[in-house]
């Protein structure tokens, strides 16, 4: 009798480990950002059988530079909505490309202060949380140049692409779904 109980406990432990990797329903992926309200009985829900490859186009600045960019919050909300139904995209399957007026949101504090007059970039903690969740946050090098931002001041959790235009075209041709600003 003791051996079957130990075997059952081992199986349950293994199942919970597998479930943690797959995503657990009700799970918040990005804590503190992208608040959601779970809804029962929705007609359409995230599909655990799909591979979510999504590209977020981030061009708009926040209403004021001391606020978190609402488009970055949208990325967190998307991940939390998926996580609420037990869906976790694979590493790099969610991509954020930042350009246009939003470009300064990817800079370290000193450069952000120079550009905006706000001492600390309120977006850096969210960008770090997104990266930890497997999101690839990128910035357009053409936008850096156009906004007179030194590429060396881009935050450590952000990659620099040749251009947002080519990134968006390439990823869509490879099957990423575009979510506009």
Which residues make up each language-model segment?
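Acidic helix-start/capping segments at beta-turn-to-alpha-helix junctions
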Residues: 88-106
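Positively charged n-region of N-terminal signal peptides that target proteins for export
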Residues: 1-5
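Acidic/histidine-rich, surface-exposed loop or edge segments in extracytoplasmic proteins
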Residues: 47-65, 107-112
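Soluble non-cytosolic domains of exported or imported proteins
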Residues: 62-73, 117-121
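Sec/Tat signal peptide C-region and signal peptidase I cleavage site
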Residues: 17-22
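Histidine-anchored nucleotide/phosphate-binding helix
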Residues: 68-87
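A cross-taxonomic marker for long C-terminal extensions/tails that follow the last structured domain
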Residues: 25-36, 107-181
């Amino acid at each position: 009798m003791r051996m079957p109980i130990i075997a059952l406990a081992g199986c349950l432990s293994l199942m919970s480990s597998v479930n943690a990797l797959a995503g657990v329903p009700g799970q918040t992926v990005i804590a503190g950002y992208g608040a959601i309200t779970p809804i029962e009985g929705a007609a359409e829900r995230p599909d655990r059988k799909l591979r979510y490859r999504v590209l977020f186009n981030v061009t708009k600045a926040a209403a004021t530079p001391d606020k978190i960019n609402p488009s970055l919050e949208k990325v967190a909300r998307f991940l939390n909505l998926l996580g609420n139904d037990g869906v976790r995209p694979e590493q790099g399957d969610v991509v954020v490309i930042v350009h246009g007026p939003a470009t300064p949101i990817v800079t370290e504090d000193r450069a952000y202060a120079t550009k905006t007059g706000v001492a600390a970039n309120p977006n850096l903690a969210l960008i770090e949380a997104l990266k930890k969740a497997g999101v690839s946050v990128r910035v357009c090098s053409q936008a850096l140049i156009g906004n007179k931002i030194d590429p060396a001041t881009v935050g450590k959790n952000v990659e620099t692409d040749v251009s947002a235009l080519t990134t968006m075209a390439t990823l869509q041709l490879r099957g990423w779904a575009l979510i506009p600003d």
